[in-house]
Regions:
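Glycine-/charge-enriched secondary-structure boundary and capping motifs
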Residues: 2-9, 115-133, 146-155, 203-221, ...
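Glycine-rich anion-binding loops of enzyme active sites
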Residues: 43, 56, 64-65, 75, ...
Length: 294
């Protein structure tokens, strides 16, 4: 029987119900601040407000999900921060915004200075690659909330960006005949780990070495690619009608921009780690849908 995301403990349909209910509540706050006009709110890659001076202020928050579990199993903490930065900046650039500041949030079951330093080293690496300062953050020690043997933690962040109103990329100008151009990923990035873990670790150890894949844990921990520089350069030099960060939902994210049909006739080579996941009973459709393959 095929392994699915639902069987791995994540029911996407129920999550969508929660998002719909939350969205209605969030929308009710959109007229509370007269100095900032909401240009685009809940449901896009970033919340956008028009601020005095005519500029558009964009904000977005995201985390690394259960990739932290792999980090703990491998006892490797110096790259997970890159993922956190990437998941934020890769979304905010999808509206054409330049990331200008970042704050992080680390929650853990206990204080561990060496591990915290390694996590922040990754954040700094990601920030440098994005040309974006980290201006603050929060470290919360909550043993009653974050449970687990040894060290257990969660990692998230928030990015702020700026964009001129004329340079906004919202996807509303997408039209028939537009060309879709994709950028390669480094691997699984930061989505689909609940399913990937269930698929792989029932048969293999996290440190098993597989031909063509390498050490499973290393393959799973490859940092999420940061696309800030090439995407923003492209936005400045070319006419871009829409941008999509392919994460959870995979290629269906293209429909999030505008309900225009599309055909992708040239896909990149399937990453070896994904082929290994498929061999464990996860169908290709599920791999793509839950963005195990980006």
């Amino acid at each position: 029987m095929a392994l699915t995301y639902k069987k791995a403990g994540v029911d996407i349909s129920k999550i969508k119900q929660s998002q719909k209910a939350i969205g209605k509540l969030i929308t009710s706050t959109h007229k509370l601040q007269k100095k900032a006009k909401i240009a685009h709110g809940f449901g896009h890659y970033a919340g956008i407000v028009e601020i005095p001076g005519g500029k558009m202020l964009a904000t977005h928050t995201d985390g690394v999900g259960t990739k932290v579990v792999i980090s703990n199993l491998m006892k490797k903490y110096n790259t997970i921060g890159i993922d956190c930065v990437a998941m934020n900046v890769n979304d905010i650039i999808c509206i054409g915004a330049t990331p200008i500041s970042f704050v992080d949030y680390i929650a853990a079951n206990k204080n561990d200075v060496p591990k915290f330093k390694k996590i922040v080293e990754g954040l700094v690496t990601g920030a440098k690659k994005s040309a974006m300062p980290i201006v603050g953050g929060e470290t919360a020690i909550m043993p009653d909330v974050i449970e687990g043997e040894g060290f257990a933690y969660d990692l998230a962040g928030m990015v702020v960006g700026l964009v001129e109103k004329k340079d906004l990329v919202l996807g509303n100008k997408i039209k028939t005949g537009d060309v879709i151009i994709g950028a390669n990923s480094t691997g699984i990035h930061s989505n689909g780990y609940s399913l990937a873990r269930k698929a792989l670790l029932k048969k293999y150890s996290i440190k098993d070495k597989i031909k063509g894949v390498g050490v499973i844990g290393d393959a799973l921990l490859k940092p999420t690619e940061i696309y800030t520089n090439p995407v923003l350069e492209m936005v400045q030099k070319c006419k871009i009608n829409g941008l999509a960060h392919i994460t959870g939902g995979a290629f269906t994210k293209l429909l999030r921009l505008k309900n225009t049909g599309y055909q992708i006739d040239s896909l990149p080579k399937i990453p070896p780690i994904m082929e290994l996941i498929q061999e464990q009973g996860v169908k290709m459709k599920k791999c793509i849908r839950h963005s195990i393959w980006e």
